[in-house]
A protein has these predicted regions:
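Short beta-strand segments enriched for Tyr within beta-sheet-rich domains
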Residues: 87, 163-166
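RNA pseudouridine synthases
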Residues: 1-140, 144-150, 154
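Beta-rich strand-turn-strand
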Residues: 154, 160-164
């Protein structure tokens, strides 16, 4: 199967590679491209597939973290098992700091704050998450208002925990 032509091709265009080492590659993931394979045929293109085309010598697990399909951003990918283990440990120890920038409809009056909720998978509406104070896992996100543009607010979100779809 060929990579989806709607996206910049990570496998062929060097412009999407931000940094390349012997063990780790940093790439820009466009929105609407999966990080890893899906079992749905309409989503056969993904970053992992493209990386394996570009770096056929890469071994072992490659993706120590993911970005949601709708999210664009930077991915740190491992090209060998040792690098994967090292990156995974950094994510597990929360040594990696992530920031997501979003533009919200409406005006957010708070300059900064945090949100603490208990989240779990919504089994009837995967891959969505729901708030569940009994069975959910703690999720903590800090946010900062970066500015107002018309009727929209630019906000930086910094997840402290690493919950799916946090």
């Amino acid at each position: 199967m060929e990579p989806d032509p709607r996206h910049a091709d990570i496998a062929e265009q060097r412009g999407d590679t931000r940094m390349l080492g012997t063990s780790i590659v940093i790439v820009d993931k466009p929105a609407w491209l999966l990080t890893t394979p899906s079992n749905r045929p309409e989503y056969n293109d993904n970053v992992l597939k493209r990386i394996k085309i570009r770096f056929p010598w890469a071994q072992g697990p490659i993706t120590p973290h993911r970005l949601d399909m709708a999210t664009s951003g930077v991915l740190a990918l491992a090209l060998n098992p040792q690098a994967h283990r090292h990156l995974s440990q950094q994510f597990a120890k929360r040594e990696v700091h992530k920031t997501y920038i979003a533009i919200l409809d409406g005006i957010l009056s708070n300059r900064r704050g945090s949100v603490r909720l208990s989240l779990r998978g919504d089994f009837s509406n995967r891959p969505r998450q729901i708030v569940d104070s009994i069975h959910g896992k703690a999720a903590h996100t800090r946010y900062e208002n970066l500015g107002i543009e018309g009727e929209k607010t630019r906000v930086a979100f910094r997840p402290i925990t690493g919950r799916t779809h946090q």
